[in-house]
Amino acid sequence: MKIVKHYWFIAIALITMISFSSCESDEERGFDISGLYGKTWWGEMGFEDPYGERLYSYITFTSGAFPDHGVGTEERCYYDDELYRVYKFDWEIQNGWLYLYYSDGYTFIIEYPSVSGRYFYGTAEDGFEIRLEWVDGRSIRKKV
């Protein structure tokens, strides 16, 4: 009987622990991505120029009163920091997915974005694994 009570105690403790742990809300994800005054991230998001050359992004997220949506700027560059193009976008997080609505009508979706330390992770809708690094300051791109 003592053994059964012991197992019941363990089972109830596990259930209680699981019920108190929850998934991150859209607002929490948004704040992790945009911070209080905006955050800039750098890395590869799976984009290429028309000739197949990889493009890297300096992408800045800012939010207003609500941290689950806001506006942003993306500077796509070549690896040597030569500027390819600058894009403006609106962004929002819905049900854990990050939607970027570019001013040219293109929508880019990042599934289950997360922030761990100085890194932003997510999966693009085409399966590309995104890993961006947080950079101090709003834009550190070398002006070539």
Provide a role label for each language-model segment.
Residues 1-9:
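Bacterial N-terminal signal peptides that target proteins for export
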Residues 18-22:
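C-terminal motif of bacterial Sec signal peptides marking the signal peptidase cleavage site
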